[in-house]
Curated annotation (Swiss-Prot):
Its EC number is 2.7.7.77. This is Molybdenum cofactor guanylyltransferase. It comes from the Bacteria. Monomer. One of its GO terms (biological process) is bis(molybdopterin guanine dinucleotide)molybdenum biosynthetic process.
Amino acid sequence: MNLDEVITGVVLAGGKARRMGGADKGLLELDGKPLWRHVADALAPQLATVVISANRHLDIYQASGLKVIPDSIADFPGPLAGMLSVFQQVAGDWFLFCPCDNPCIPHNLVDRLAAHRHGAPVVWVHDGERDHPTIALINRAVEPQLTAYLQAGERRVMIFMRQVGGHAVDFSDCKEAFVNVNTPEELAQWQKRP
């Protein structure tokens, strides 16, 4: 199966961004463009379609021309809620999720995740030191379990991913590609890089 033809890319831009003082992290600029755009631009050559999952400033995201998927669950309940909203509102079987604060994802992210899926409904990035469960290739088949998990009040991404039979894919050879931007200081450091 050639997954790259049927995978929808999703930029997760719905976090509370507490460490950014509540600012909409996806709209913060790095090198003259919003963080979410860096991720969308990196995903676009790898996938036929890219959408944005967001829960505020929808008009700004919609001005990009990309389809914007609002959360179907109120009160910012986390990335799993954004994922469920995408399953509910976008056709297709496979979705590649990536948070808006990972501006340097590798050009072969989709191919590597798909190649190491080995039949699992969920695979995510491991950078050699830590898991990145929100950078994940996920099949719609997990939607019923995800719905039940969220209805039970659960929010922990890693636990859910393991419960549905997922596993990590090793990206230790490009660990630096998964450094994210969480604080104003980190954003300033990114701005200073060569």
